[in-house]
């Protein structure tokens, strides 16, 4: 999340970054400074310590020095220097990274009138545009804590030096800091990388490659259930399903603009067919445009809705890869709608309703909507400025008509059109884009897509790109953390653990398993040699949504005692009614992982 530069929290975190750098230079005056910005939840500063980097053992001493600087109430004052003056000042302490950046700011015209901003507090001076607190004493007692050390390439370039990044947490007061630390502790327990391994959902193998997850049987069930749901929803909404190849000749991507606009996120080309270049596809869009173009279209065909769970491949730097959240191979809940100009609003509203229905059903509540706009000053966007403004206004008005609160973010649009992004927050408030919907006014022209209008004229369709359930990888990573691995019955890899209290009822337990299997309900019998309590504990640890306990009374009356995950009530039900209840929970996709949802009997 971007922080408002005029906000008090921005000033606090930015000032603490400077105080951190000042404290570090007290113990390591030879350190070279990189960047030190405020960020979500705190701040960081990058340093080059040469051959002797600091460790996390040094953080305690650095923090003590920061507190001393805070207690001195050093005033922050702003000044400006020419490039020549800045170079001379920075050269005194061999701040080569700062000198490089100073030259860049002047050469690119980003330094107003060629003047570079500097801030001074006490004996410390740093090139900076601010803003800051009035003085260091305005930092509230106990509101910050140095957090960790990580590596970071200078300017994010793997070919440049590796710097040491010191992270700090900072909030308006001590209570807010402690609250964040507690929420982070809970989030670490729910981390999808941790639970993904514990629950056998996915694996990453070095020989397979970084960012290329192996979906294990349990994870594949999660994928299959989400995909089945999406296919039902899309069928009812009039979508037609297609399947398209994952590699494509380079000509297609030059036509679409992915080459060159998206080239940095694509894998290198493959040479074949007498040196023709093929690429792994980063997106499904060009293939769907070719499906549309495969035969003449009329206004009677529109809206023409194409859907595919398509496999995509995008090059992400190794350092940015993270579990399922950031990967190099992904499968997207993708669709493209080709429609007339006067159908755009209705289609967009239908998509918004689809998103709302998904999110409401899954009980997502903590999210915000962003209208992502182009940046007229950037060359990474294609198309006419007037058309950009018209398309952006269309999406803006649609969101207003839907009575959706939204933020506008300049420069975050797709290269071919504005988009609506859904930013979902996790336990610690970190935001990730989970879903997106884009209005495209460029690709119909690039691909020469047409339809015959009512008056017999050839016209260009508008294209809407949408992916409400994101990629399997990103969406499931979020579901794991949101539910803490405790999925609803319809989605859960093992829907029922059948636990006989002893060998004398094992046959009845296996009979139940066979009955459930015949109904396509996933179940397992735990009749291992472990004690009954241990077997119950195993089912809880694996977060199985339902345990059916089988004792002598249950076997005699052909019933089960039903224990749900994290629910105290344990009713005893006739077997046939229990199976009917499970079938209802599955068919209605009930969110029974929430305690307020009762067994439908």
Walk through the language-model features, giving the residues of each.
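A translation/RNA-centric and nucleic-acid-associated enzymatic feature enriched
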Residues: 275-277, 286-287, 291-295, 304, ...
């Amino acid at each position: 999340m971007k922080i408002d530069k005029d906000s008090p929290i921005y000033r606090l975190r930015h000032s603490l970054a400077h105080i951190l750098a000042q404290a570090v230079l007290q113990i390591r005056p030879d350190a070279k400074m990189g960047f030190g910005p405020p960020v979500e939840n705190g701040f960081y500063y990058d340093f080059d310590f040469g051959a002797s980097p600091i460790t996390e053992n040094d953080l305690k001493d650095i923090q003590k020095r920061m507190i001393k600087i805070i207690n001195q109430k050093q005033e922050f004052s702003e000044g400006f220097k020419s490039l020549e003056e800045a170079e001379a000042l920075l050269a005194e302490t061999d701040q080569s990274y700062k000198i490089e950046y100073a030259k860049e700011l002047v050469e690119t015209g980003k330094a107003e009138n060629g003047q570079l901003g500097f801030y001074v507090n006490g004996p410390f001076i740093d090139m900076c545009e601010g803003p800051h607190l009035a003085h260091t004493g305005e930092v509230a007692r106990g509101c910050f804590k140095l957090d960790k050390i990580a590596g970071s390439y200078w300017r994010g370039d793997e070919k440049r030096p590796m710097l040491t990044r010191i992270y700090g947490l900072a909030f308006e007061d001590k209570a807010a800091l402690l609250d964040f630390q507690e929420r982070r502790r809970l989030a670490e327990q729910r981390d999808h990388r941790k639970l993904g391994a514990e629950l056998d959902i996915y694996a990453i193998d070095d020989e397979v490659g970084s960012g290329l997850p192996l979906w294990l049987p349990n994870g594949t069930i999660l994928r299959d259930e989400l995909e089945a749901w999406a296919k039902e929803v899309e069928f009812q909404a009039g979508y037609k399903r297609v399947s398209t190849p994952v590699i494509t000749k380079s000509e297609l991507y030059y036509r679409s603009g992915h080459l060159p606009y998206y080239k940095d996120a694509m894998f290198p080309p493959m040479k074949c067919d007498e040196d023709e270049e093929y690429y792994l596809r980063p997106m499904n869009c060009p293939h769907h445009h070719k499906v549309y173009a495969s035969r003449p279209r009329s206004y009677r065909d529109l809206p023409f809705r194409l859907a595919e769970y398509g496999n995509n491949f995008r090059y992400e730097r190794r350092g940015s890869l993270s579990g399922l959240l950031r990967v190099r191979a992904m499968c997207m809940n993708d669709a493209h709608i080709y429609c007339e100009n006067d159908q755009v609003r209705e289609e967009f509203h239908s998509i918004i309703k689809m998103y709302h229905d998904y999110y409401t059903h899954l009980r997502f509540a903590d999210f915000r909507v962003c209208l992502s706009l182009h940046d007229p000053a950037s060359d990474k966007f294609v198309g006419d400025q007037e058309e950009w403004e018209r398309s952006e206004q269309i999406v803006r008005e649609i969101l207003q008509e839907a009575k959706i609160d939204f933020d506008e973010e300049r420069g975050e649009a797709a290269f071919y059109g504005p988009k609506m992004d859904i930013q979902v927050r996790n336990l610690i408030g970190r935001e990730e884009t989970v879903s997106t919907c884009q209005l495209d006014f460029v690709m119909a022209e690039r691909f020469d897509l047409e339809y015959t209008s009512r008056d017999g004229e050839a016209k260009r369709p508008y294209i809407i790109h949408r992916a409400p359930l994101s990629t399997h990888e990103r969406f499931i990573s979020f579901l794991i953390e949101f539910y803490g691995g405790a999925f609803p019955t319809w989605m859960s890899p093992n829907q029922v653990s059948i636990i006989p209290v002893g060998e004398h009822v094992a046959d009845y337990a296996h009979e139940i398993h066979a009955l459930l299997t015949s109904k396509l309900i996933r179940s397992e019998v735990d009749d291992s040699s472990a004690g009954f309590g241990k077997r119950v504990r195993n089912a809880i640890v694996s977060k199985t949504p339902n345990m059916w306990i089988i004792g002598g009374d249950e076997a005699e009356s052909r019933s089960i005692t039903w224990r749900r995950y994290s629910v105290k009530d344990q009713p005893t039900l006739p077997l046939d009614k229990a199976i009917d209840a499970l079938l209802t929970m599955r068919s209605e996709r009930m969110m029974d992982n929430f305690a307020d949802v009762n067994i439908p009997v």
